[in-house]
Amino acid sequence: MELYPGVSPVGLLLLLLLGQGPSQIHGSSGENTLAWQSQQVFWTLKNFPFPCKPKKLELSVLSESVHSLRPSDIKLVAAIGNPEIPLAPGSGTINMEKPQSIKNQPQDVCMGIMTVLSDIIRHFSPSVLMPTCSPGKGTAVHTTAEDLWIQAKELVRRLKDNPQLDFEKDWKLITVFFSNTSQCHLCPSAQQKSHLMRHMEMLWGVLDYLHHEVPRAFVNLVDLSEVLAMDLQHQETGFSPAPEVCKCTETTTLSKAVMQWSYQEAWEDLLASSKFNKHETFAVVFQPFFDEIEPPLKRSSPQDPTTLALRIWNSMMEPVGQKDGLLNTAERKTMKCPSEESPYLFTYKNSNYQARRLKPITKLQMKEGSEFTCPDKNPSNSIPTTVHSLRPADIKIIGALGDSLTAGNGAGASPWNILDVLTEYRGLSWSVGGDETIKTVTTLPNILREFNPSLKGFSVGTGKESTSRASFNQAVAGAKSDGLAGQARKLVDLMKADKTINFQEDWKIITVFIGGNDLCASCSNSTRFSPQNFIDNIKNALDILHAEVPRAFVNMAMVMEITPLRELFNEPTVSCPRNILSRLCPCVLGLGDNSEELSSLVQRNRDYQKKTEELINSGRYDTRDNFTVVVQPLFENVSMPRTPEGVPDKSFFAPDCFHFNAKTHARSAIALWKNMLEPVGHKTRHNNFEIKAPIVCPNQASPFLSTTKNSNLGNGTWMVCEERAPSASPPTSVHTLRPADIQVVAALGDSLTAGNGISSQEGNLTDVSTQYRGLSYSAGGDKTLENVTTLPNILRKFNGNLTGYSVGTGDSSSANAFLNQAVPGAKAENLTSQVRTLVQKMKSDNRVNFNRDWKVITVMIGASDLCDFCTDSNHYSAANFFDHLQNALDILHKEVPRALVNLVDFINPSIIREVFLKNPDKCPVNQSSVLCNCVLTPRKDSYELARLEAFTKSYQSSMLQLVESGRYDTREDFSVVLQPFLLNTKLPVLENGKPDTSFFAPDCIHLNQKFHTQLARALWANMLEPLGKKTDTLDPKGHISLACPTKDQPFLRTFRNSNYKYPTKPAIENWGSDFLCTEKSPSSQVPTSVHELRPADIKVVAAMGDFLTTATGARPSGYKRLATPWRGLSWSIGGDGKLETHTTLPNILKKFNPSITGFSTGTLDNKAGLNVAEEGARAQDMPAQAKTLVKKMKSTPTINLQEDWKLITLLIGNNDLCLYCENPEDNSTKEYVKYIQQALDILYEELPRVFINVVEVMELAGLHHVQGGKCAMPLAVQKNCSCLRHSQNLTAMQELKKLNWNLQSGISELSYWHRYMEREDFAVTVQPFFRNTFIPLNEREGLDLTFFSEDCFYFSDRGHAEMAIALWNNMLEPVGWKTSSNNFIYNRTKLKCPSPERPFLYTLRNSQLLPDKAEEPSNALYWAVPVAAIGGLAVGILGVMLWRTVKPVQQEEEEEDTLPNTSVTQDAVSEKRLKAGN
């Protein structure tokens, strides 16, 4: 055997010098081998989807060059060398089919791999022949490399003898398996080197033989060392010799990863330059098989043949130089395909591979110095005795503990010299290196040497921790936290033994940084690397330092946020040795982007950080004056540096793309130094290393290194923001508003904003009534930011001329309050009053330039509403809350120029409840019903408490809905932004689990200054966070660093400068309602009086009317079927589905009495139930409908006519209005009322126990007046409502309106008719919700046609749902106080509820508009009430007319009280006055 002349043994020795151990080439023993032909085993892919499209890649001409060889050109697949992987069917990712007789022989495994590979190629080349694995001739159980020669010769013979193969012309794919099982990478012995040389020469000879003998061949050289080594971890294979004992004193993950990479590179370079790749008909390509990049516990081991075959195939599809050989689970299941651009198998030539020796390896100057400009470099006048008055110049000794980032691995390596990552450049280490000076190398020691040139302990040059150059840098490359205590022990011993220092007297700085390697390995052993074990290891090390080292300031550098490393790894345009990266940190880089494992890792990272802070903040290391540990969070939030093109910038990393280079060490040193000078609690936690920051200097007012004790700012905050400049010129857009542009600050809200009890001392309950407005989080301006943290004090750091803030104490009318117009106890309904006062003050105060000054207004409301919601859940409904808030914001939007409005969530009442009830010794529990009844008094797990939670969520949802409607984003100089930091507030608790009352005022309800400080910081942070990424949690005990604007993002964030699109509202699937009522029980006995009738007493429902009650057109059905009556959806009588999906009166009543009967379902006549309405019915048809209804009731066997209470709803008049113009004389009001009266008389005479709703006819003319051309079928309107043909005729429409009002007026008297009051079991109640019918508008202020059918005439199912809600709510409102307008704003919680105090359906008598029966005077009273009501109706109608007429003209002068959605009309006021007068 000869080597190729151009490759000497010296070339192979390169592999040895790179650290490779002996290579074992294993052949087949020949024993127990299946006969090659007769016992051929056929392996197949089962149920595996083939993703490639071979036809697109086909060529009619066979390739003449191996460098353009396509899979379709291959005729035969073969292999020599045995992979020796034990079979494990089912262990891989793809199922195999094989006969049961197959045994675990090496030959079998080889055939399995080749068969699968052949099956893949068969999709491209159907004529591919059956694969072959050449058997060896040896007889030993473990054969030597010579057997590979036997297999190679046997293979060549078989290929030549194969009659189906054209040996000279057909292309062959040959795989050569070999393995190097020695794991000794760094220090092979002389014997091992000799052994390896001999075997590699043999392997080279085999390749030379194939090159000489086999034309047209593509040879894969496959090293299965890694696969075999992994299998040996699980079981002894019986086919491979055990690895030789490694004589190295130590090996690390880093060294193994680097040497494995070097091994691959050496093969690549050797083969690329060899004769094997110089010709057109032959090529040898090294196919690396490294470990998978996934947690060891998830690996499928041993590997099955199918997986190995896929890995060979996929490697052939990757260009040389880009073959990482690293796969996660998902990738192992994926078959790669040739691309149209590169449809061939990759060789060194067609991959444009550049050998490493040709790559630039010049040593680049990576060091980065800094300018030092601090003027005061003096030490203390005398050596300090306390660590809390320690100046930088007092430091005499420096040391460090940690891992390879502190050891400096690769810090000085040139970009291409990956081997140099193994060099520990300790002199460049960020925290303890001392090479050169600060001008050329930036490190913490070099900064400190500017203060004290005699500093000792820093490391210089390169070397291990055991070398003298390391000095007190005892960091160990590859170290994990469980090795930290050993480092601490070693450091203490070194310091004590050093005769050049005074161990007892010299002040020391020791920096500890550990945890990255724990995180990188944590997914393989979550117990060992749990957050608790991590912090226990930290504690053990710090305990040693605390116990033994005097005069020490310890920097505990927080573990780095490690997941940004994924950005570098996943960026395809960045050239990194990904196999090294994957080995160094498999837990970070081997997980899917949205996997649970990655989420767990991110949480573990945070828990490491959190527990570190908890340990240090516990005070464990603050028991002596001469020792402290301070958390330095410079690495807590680290952004991946990026190039100007936006890709991760590898120039910040060592050649392995994992460790820091000298530039990053320098910038880390500056960040650490800055942290050391920043007060505890106000340290910079986010660093962008792209920007080279200057070296900061000690503050003359505070020249000491910051400790917990000397950083005690109380409730103040340290301003660390550098970008504080205003815009170059005053901005005209709220979306380009900088903090320094704000000139006015204001606030609205309740007692929290007013500042009640902020500074009240514990136990001084009466002082909670004091309004400490100067300390209020959103509006207070007492003292300065260093003493009092509030939003105004933060803004004053940007603009010292800020105005509007409150100071001292006082109520909203005091001069101290200024523009803080919050009022204690204020509810949402009071907000408009505050807004008007605020607007007036801003307009009239000469300190405010109303039109030019930019304003920030903070609004917080809702807590007081929840305190009282249970007293009247209808009044405090979410719908009303929404309306009140909208009305207030509407005024600001209309009246106030240049304003950014912060809408702040209220604190969840559950927090207040927990604090209050779990501290009975400190909180005034006996006064809970007075302080906040509906929050504090419900029992645990009660229905009342569940309702509180439901109302809370509804309020919060209303706020979000209002802001995200875009209603307040129509002007360039105004925006409302929801700041959600209070959405998920964490209860502050003590170590014993009790709520921490130190955050609360003496009443345990209001918040003290400690809590307000956190609110201000959180609000400010929210203002700088983009929409969609705002923090929606608050931990009062957590650290909230002061957020800062940046050069890239200098603006207060709005929807536009956040590039945020309000989410499209999901399609509403149904128009159901949520049922929140608790009072659902019937009367204890069946009532005999209609005036004591509860909803649950109702047994029968019925209805009379026209197309509205038949629900004609409620669902789309096309033009020809427009007249379909959807009775099951009818507002007053439909019973389809359930309340949660279909809001109808019967479905509401079913919640009180599930056995109710009479309702309609579906569309068929026989399912109409007691719905006797007819589509075209008019008033004249009501007597006939009444007779029909009576007959039906009497004939229905399930109805007990005498005993069952019946609810009948009558609505008629729409057709009368639509057709009156055809014969005005026959459509008089008198006739209309007469027919209804006749119908009621029939019911009165025939039916016992009846409650009748008579619904006033809707204001039809107004409803259909301004629809323009938006109707899909306007002709249908004209056909069904001929009077509307004249909608453009003002006189005709006035006549229609007049009749409309007269019909409403006439029917409104029915509630007061004496005839219907004579029976105790009969009542008629007029329900007036349609009296003032307003056209529903959509969010764009256009007509909302979703309330109507396709022809815009009938009501849709949505319209029916809203009618049902309005009717039900009218039934629960006293006569004289009923809502007389429709509110069709969608809300699932608009249904009112009976209460224990008012459980009945309202009649005239139980509305207390009449005296008791015993005192009843003459009938005159019954007529006095309706007369007053009619007069009030006229006033109401005139008001509506005036509003509709004047609104378009006087829109700019419209006041908030003109909004009529939920107003009570004038007739109610008149009736109330009449009652009072009588």
UniProtKB/Swiss-Prot annotation:
Q: Where are the glycosylation sites? A: N180, N525, N626, N637, N715, N764, N787, N801, N830, N926, N1227, N1280, N1289, N1387
Q: Enumerate the SUPFAM superfamilies for this protein.
A: SGNH hydrolase
Report the superkingdom from the record. Eukaryota
Which Pfam families does the annotation name?
Lipase_GDSL
Where is this protein found?
Apical cell membrane
UniProt catalytic activity: a 1,2-diacyl-sn-glycero-3-phosphocholine + H2O = a 1-acyl-sn-glycero-3-phosphocholine + a fatty acid + H(+); a 1-O-alkyl-2-acyl-sn-glycero-3-phosphocholine + H2O = a 1-O-alkyl-sn-glycero-3-phosphocholine + a fatty acid + H(+); a 1-acyl-sn-glycero-3-phosphocholine + H2O = sn-glycerol 3-phosphocholine + a fatty acid + H(+); a triacylglycerol + H2O = a diacylglycerol + a fatty acid + H(+)
Report the EC number(s), separated by commas if there are several: 3.1.1.5, 3.1.1.4, 3.1.1.3
Which N-terminal stretch is annotated as signal sequence?
A: 1-27
- According to the UniProt record, where is the region Disordered? 1451-1478
Q: Name the major location.
A: membrane
Gene3D superfamilies in the cross-refs: SGNH hydrolase (3.40.50.1110)
Q: Does the keyword Lipid metabolism apply?
A: yes
Q: Which residues form the active site?
A: S404, D518, H659
| Record-level GO cellular component terms | apical plasma membrane; brush border membrane
The answer to whether keyword Hydrolase applies is: yes
Question: Mind telling me which InterPro entries this protein's record contains?
Answer: GDSL, Lipase_GDSL_AS, Phospholipase_B, PLB1, SGNH_hydro_sf
Q: Which UniProt keywords apply?
A: Cell membrane, Glycoprotein, Hydrolase, Lipid metabolism, Membrane, Phospholipid metabolism, Repeat, Signal, Transmembrane, Transmembrane helix
Provide the membrane-side ranges marked Cytoplasmic in the record. 1444-1478
Q: What protein am I looking at?
A: Phospholipase B1, membrane-associated
Q: Which organism is it from?
A: Mus musculus (Mouse)
